[in-house]
């Protein structure tokens, strides 16, 4: 496992604010250099994973993780941004991503006794659900097991920017989501 620096759980670094534009520039350069305009779905998926690997090669994983998922201030609210996640999510680091989310949850539980998760899923698609299927299923099995500490201390999961086809995406994973968890999911129209 890579050292990702859990000492500071909240996002406050000015460098993190610049990270998004640097990632965007790298993705643009990658797209131009690798001629990623192919239309085959499997090719596009491979190219997205290759681009994610390129982002991982150029940026510190800890910075990427802290930009993707963080605790806002001194609160018990964990924010997860899919728009950042998708820029670097690669099967080689799925365990590290899960470790980061678990560490944030445990920090909130130890500090506040409870926690909430806020997830921005803007631009999440059915193909993204398929691409990250292994990670999503692992998240459900590790983090959202019935009667686990993480479930017992979870107040709500707020979902922001749900795509129109979100119900279709939810059906894909509905067998893995416990009824107790489903009752804690709240869809919010505005973004965080």
Where are these regions (language model features)?
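SEC14/CRAL-TRIO lipid-binding/transfer domains and related phosphoinositide-recognition modules
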Residues: 1-156, 160, 164-192
């Amino acid at each position: 496992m890579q050292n990702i620096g859990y000492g500071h759980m909240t996002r406050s670094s000015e460098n993190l604010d610049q990270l998004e534009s640097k990632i965007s520039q790298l993705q643009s350069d990658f797209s131009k250099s690798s001629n990623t305009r192919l239309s085959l779905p499997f090719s596009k998926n491979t190219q997205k994973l290759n681009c994610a690997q390129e982002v991982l090669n150029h940026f510190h994983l800890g910075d990427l993780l802290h930009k993707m998922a963080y605790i806002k201030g001194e609160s018990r609210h964990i924010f997860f941004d899919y728009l950042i996640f998708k820029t670097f999510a690669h099967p080689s680091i799925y365990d590290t991503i899960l470790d980061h989310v678990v560490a944030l949850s445990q920090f909130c539980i130890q500090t506040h006794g409870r926690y909430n998760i806020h997830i921005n899923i803007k631009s999440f698609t059915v193909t993204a659900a398929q691409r990250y299927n292994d990670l999503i299923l692992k998240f459900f099995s590790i983090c959202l097991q019935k009667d686990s500490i993480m479930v017992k201390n979870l107040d709500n999961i707020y979902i922001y920017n749900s795509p129109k086809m979100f119900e279709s995406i939810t059906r894909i994973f509905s067998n893995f989501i416990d009824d107790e968890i489903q009752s804690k999911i709240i869809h919010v129209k505005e973004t965080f």
